[in-house]
A protein has these predicted regions:
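Bacterial carbohydrate/catabolite-sensing allosteric modules
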Residues: 6-354
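Conserved long alpha-helical elements within nucleotide-processing catalytic cores of c-di-GMP signaling
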Residues: 525-548, 555-585, 591-595, 599-600, ...
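Amphipathic alpha-helical "output/dimerization" segments
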Residues: 476-496, 502-510
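Catalytic-core segments of nucleotide cyclases and related cyclic-nucleotide turnover enzymes
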Residues: 331, 566, 611-618, 626-629, ...
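Catalytic core regions of nucleotide second-messenger enzymes
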Residues: 303-308, 591-592, 621-637, 670-673
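A short, aliphatic-rich beta-strand micro-motif
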Residues: 451-460
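Helix-loop-beta substructure at the N-terminus of cytosolic sensory domains
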Residues: 359-408
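Amphipathic HAMP/coiled-coil signal-transducing linker helices
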Residues: 355-356, 505-526, 538
Length: 673
């Protein structure tokens, strides 16, 4: 290698070493800032009546989210089979609020919504939007299906009743007659009893529609059966089991001595009951963990299972006659420790709800409402905590004539929704934060380091929605012994009353205005004078201003009517009123005091203002005459009086004096022509 080339290579090598060394130094002194990882957003569509299962799912999901990678937005409805269609529509509209493409994955509790069709529709919407979606309990093609194994746990339960308790005669209380999970649970029990030579006749199958009311009637019917109670009543969920047990106890029966009652779902209320329910656990905690891990794998590009079976298992309690050895006594003692404090919390929340209902209901102005809510929550928000927001479409309250269907459509179409009250994560209470379908939580920060759960509930009147409520999933009001749904419902009732108050005020103001206005001229009539003149008079006395009272009267009005007809006479009155209105100061009033007499009242500093006004009115009258559009010549007479400092005359005396001065002017004009 020549000397020249060696020098070139040496220089290049030196340069590379220099850059490498200095780059390391620069990185050490000025380290590159870490880019904060944005959390993923998960939307969950749930029915509020399945809150216990949802909470178990969320508990499992969050326990698996060890790196706080996810924020969860739960969209709640309380639609049900036995509600009015309009109410259900208003509840279900919450599912239309989010833009699904704004979320990284969806979880639809398809088996516990108001209908199977609702769940399937939501899942298909997500698939069409290209968003990964879990369908819980109902299999939908294209979704990640988490199917609950209703069979294994129910088989265990049925065998336990036969083999341990020798149950022969059974009544089954199903959910909705056409619901697939209700059908599966009933068929499983019947199959097991059939296999053991103890068939269950069709007349022993009842349907409580998953709730209390029909189940209470079924319990009464069973108690009145001449054949007596069956050996066991198997309910297809814990709520119906609890309702049945409660009614039978009220009727004087002792459980489980007189009859065994079992459930399905393993909800906390059943485990706090006496006797503790024997039931089946569908393990929603595991479902939550599976959802979290599957989403993480999918977002990381890993292959995932599209069909996952979640096993159910028998949970033996006391209601079947087992566990009479005090196994659950310690749990009851722990629950007993909080019984009174829980009751105090409920009482306190009831008081808070009453105060809020009155605060909202007795308000008839939107601006006043926002101020009252901010003031209220600034002083007390122990139950709702931070990250609590009431978001509304303001037009619903500010435009009382707004069509309610248009209100809902505009709100969904990125209309001007805003928070009427917001409690931020820092305890600050604000109002007026704008939101949209893409940014539903005021102040939401996707980059913070903690994971959050938000509950969103619809606000609606019948089928028309005007907003929603956001509650932090960890707020005190979400605890089992408090009724979050009732809290939101009271908001809806209070807002409905409040909007009615605004409407009534608008109509009353409109009627009052109509009653105070002269229809021919648009000026105040005598009733308007009674309501408006005295406040001006009182204000002048209070402020030390001088009161001006002026009369204006049309000259030769009788001649205009006689010669040119009453139509032209009416025109003369309207023209004079127009001349007065055109030049009237905002803080004065003008009254059609008689047929062709006009009264003007207002505060002035001196008589120059009155003279200027009179001159302007006369100029306007001359302009009408100059235009030549009317067959008559319009002229007016006027007179005014200005109060003097220290005057204490009543308003009627000033009006009488001004009227006399006007007639003096009128006499003079008539005598000159």
């Amino acid at each position: 290698m020549c000397k020249y080339c060696k020098e070139r290579v040496s220089k290049v090598f030196f340069y590379i070493c220099y850059v490498f060394i200095h780059r390391s130094v620069i990185k050490a002194v000025y380290p590159r800032p870490k880019v904060r990882k944005m959390k993923k957003k998960i939307a969950v569509f749930a029915n509020g009546y399945g809150l216990d299962s949802l909470k178990a799912l969320l508990k499992g999901f969050r326990s698996a989210d060890v790196n706080n990678e996810y924020d969860i937005f739960v969209f709640f409805s309380y639609a049900s089979y036995d509600e009015f269609d309009e109410f259900n529509r208003g509840e279900l509209n919450i599912y239309d609020l989010p833009d699904l493409k704004d979320y990284d994955a969806l979880i639809v509790l398809s088996n516990s919504l108001n209908s199977i069709e609702t769940g399937i529709t939501l899942v298909k919407r997500a698939i069409e939007a290209g968003v990964p979606v879990f369908s819980i309990g109902i299999e939908v093609e294209g979704a990640i299906n988490l199917i609950l194994d209703n069979v294994s746990g129910m088989k265990e339960l049925a065998k336990h009743l036969i083999e341990v308790h020798d149950v022969k005669r059974v009544a089954i209380i199903g959910g909705y007659k056409t619901h697939p999970e209700s059908i599966c649970r009933i068929d499983t029990v019947r199959q097991v009893f059939e296999e053991h030579g103890r068939p269950i006749p069709e007349e022993n199958i009842y349907y409580g529609d998953w709730g209390n009311l029909k189940t209470l009637e079924i319990a009464k019917h069973l108690a009145e059966d001449p054949a007596g109670l069956p050996d066991a009543i198997i309910a297809c969920n814990d709520i119906m089991a609890l309702a049945c047990s409660t009614e039978l106890t009220r009727l004087g029966y002792t459980l489980p001595d007189d009859v065994i009652v079992t459930g399905f779902d393993y909800v906390p209320k059943g485990q706090a009951f006496y006797p503790v329910l024997t039931t089946v656990d569908t393990d929603f905690t595991t479902i939550g963990k599976v959802c979290c891990n599957t989403i993480t794998d999918h977002l990381n590009g890993k292959a995932i299972e599209m069909h996952i079976l979640i096993n159910s298992k028998l949970m033996v309690g006391e209601s079947c006659g087992c566990c009479r050895d005090g196994l659950f006594d310690e749990r009851r003692r722990e629950q007993g420790k909080t019984t009174y404090s829980d009751a105090l919390d409920r009482e306190s929340l009831d008081g808070s709800e009453r105060a809020l209902t009155q605060l909202i209901s007795y308000t008839d102005e939107y601006g006043e409402l926002t101020k009252k809510l901010v003031d209220y929550y600034s002083g007390e928000h122990d139950f709702v905590g931070n990250d609590f927001h009431i978001v509304i479409y303001g037009k619903y309250f500010t435009d009382v004539m707004a069509d309610e269907q248009e209100v809902f459509e505009d709100a969904l179409d990125d209309g001007p929704m805003q928070s009427i009250v917001s409690i931020g994560s820092n305890d600050e209470v604000t109002t007026g934060t704008p939101v949209s379908r893409h940014d539903l939580i005021p102040g939401y920060n996707r980059a913070d380091t903690e994971s959050h759960v938000y509950f969103l509930f619809p606000l609606h009147t019948g089928l028309y929605n005007y907003g929603y409520v956001v509650v932090n999933g960890d707020a005190r009001i979400t605890r089992e012994y408090l009724d979050l749904h009732a809290y939101v419902e009271k908001f809806m009732l209070a807002f409905r009353i409040q909007r009615s108050n605004i409407q009534l005020k608008f109509y009353n103001d409109s009627l009052r205005k109509i009653s105070e206005i002269d229809t021919m001229t648009g000026l105040y009539n005598r009733l308007g004078y009674e309501n408006k003149a005295t406040p001006i008079y009182d204000n002048c006395k209070r402020s030390g201003s001088r009161l001006m009272v002026m009369f204006i009267d049309i000259n030769r009005m009788k001649r205009i009517n006689d010669v040119f007809g009453h139509i032209n006479g009416d025109a003369a009155i309207r023209l004079t009123a127009s001349a007065i209105k055109t030049n009237l100061r905002e803080d004065w009033i003008a009254v059609r005091f008689g047929g062709d007499e006009f009264l003007i009242i207002g505060g002035v500093k001196n008589k120059d203002a009155a003279e200027a006004f009179r001159s302007d009115v006369l100029a306007s009258v001359d302009r009408f005459n100059h235009e030549g559009a009317w067959p008559f010549r319009l002229s007016v007479s006027s007179g005014f009086i200005i109060s003097e400092e220290g005057d204490d005359k009543p308003l009627t005396e000033y009006i009488k004096d001004a009227d006399n001065l006007m007639y003096e002017t009128k006499k003079k004009m008539h005598s000159e022509k």
